[in-house]
């Protein structure tokens, strides 16, 4: 059973764990992070809000020595410049910290595909050698032609070397539970069992 541990931002407030695995979820504001986390663990661990920019802290959820880390969304302009800079600084520091194993799941709204700000985050994550996997959310909103176009564009990013060959991608819908079983299986088999 997953449980909420704490909200943190500055380094002295981070959860300290030497021998644990942290799966981090990050994405643009309002990409559907909280809904995905709740669907993923099949329990309500994260508050779902229609208002973008709601998550402003690093939120930790724990089950034994496994952690889910919900990072504040990026690209939300309604916060003050100072608050955005502070959040960006501490998120960057958190992701660079190598005290425990971290794996990043970057959430992309399937309706927009990878945006300019997503590309910036991908470049940063690649530069710090963090394992990255992509989750295209809200896939139920796309028709078959749009899904095919999304997959084609994703493959172009793979070919362009922006994404590593080890980057996996998942098409999911938290609402309709599409793709969740594959995602859960991947996490259990390839991350938590290591």
Swiss-Prot record:
GO molecular function, one term: metal ion binding
Cofactor(s) annotated in UniProt: Mg(2+)
Coiled-coil boundaries: none
Record has Nucleus as a keyword: no
Domain EngB-type G: 19-193
Any one Gene Ontology cellular component term annotated for this protein: cytosol
Keyword terms, alphabetized: Cell cycle, Cell division, GTP-binding, Magnesium, Metal-binding, Nucleotide-binding, Septation
GO biological process terms held by the UniProt record: division septum assembly
Residues that bind Mg(2+): 34, 55
UniProt key word Nucleotide-binding: yes
InterPro entries: G_ENGB_dom, GTP-bd, GTP-bd_ribosome_bio_YsxC, P-loop_NTPase
Ligand binding (GTP): 27-34, 53-57, 70-73, 137-140, 172-174
PANTHER family per the UniProt record, alphabetical: ENGB-TYPE G DOMAIN-CONTAINING PROTEIN, MSS1/TRME-RELATED GTP-BINDING PROTEIN
NCBIfam families: GTPase_YsxC
Biological role stated in the UniProt entry: Necessary for normal cell division and for the maintenance of normal septation.
Family as reported in the entry's similarity comment: Belongs to the TRAFAC class TrmE-Era-EngA-EngB-Septin-like GTPase superfamily. EngB GTPase family.
Protein name per UniProt: Probable GTP-binding protein EngB
Organism this protein belongs to: Mycoplasmopsis agalactiae (strain NCTC 10123 / CIP 59.7 / PG2) (Mycoplasma agalactiae)
Lineage of origin: Bacteria, Bacillati, Mycoplasmatota, Mycoplasmoidales, Metamycoplasmataceae
């Amino acid at each position: 059973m997953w449980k909420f541990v704490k909200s943190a931002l500055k380094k002295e407030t981070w959860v300290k764990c030497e021998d644990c695995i942290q799966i981090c979820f990050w994405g643009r504001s309002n990409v559907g992070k909280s809904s995905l986390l709740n669907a993923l663990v099949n329990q309500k661990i994260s508050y779902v809000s229609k208002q973008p920019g709601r998550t402003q802290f690093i939120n930790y959820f724990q089950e034994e020595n496994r952690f889910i880390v919900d990072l504040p969304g990026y690209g939300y302009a309604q916060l003050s410049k100072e608050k955005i800079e502070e959040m960006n600084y501490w998120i960057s520091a958190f992701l660079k910290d190598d005290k425990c194993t971290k794996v990043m799941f970057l959430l992309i709204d399937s309706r927009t595909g990878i945006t300019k700000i997503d590309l910036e985050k991908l470049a940063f994550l690649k530069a710090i050698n963090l394992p990255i996997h992509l989750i295209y959310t809200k896939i139920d909103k796309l028709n078959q032609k749009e899904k095919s176009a999304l997959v084609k564009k994703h493959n172009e990013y793979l070919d362009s070397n922006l994404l590593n060959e080890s980057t996996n991608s998942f098409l999911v819908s938290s609402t309709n539970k599409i793709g969740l079983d594959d995602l859960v299986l991947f996490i259990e088999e390839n991350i938590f069992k290591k």
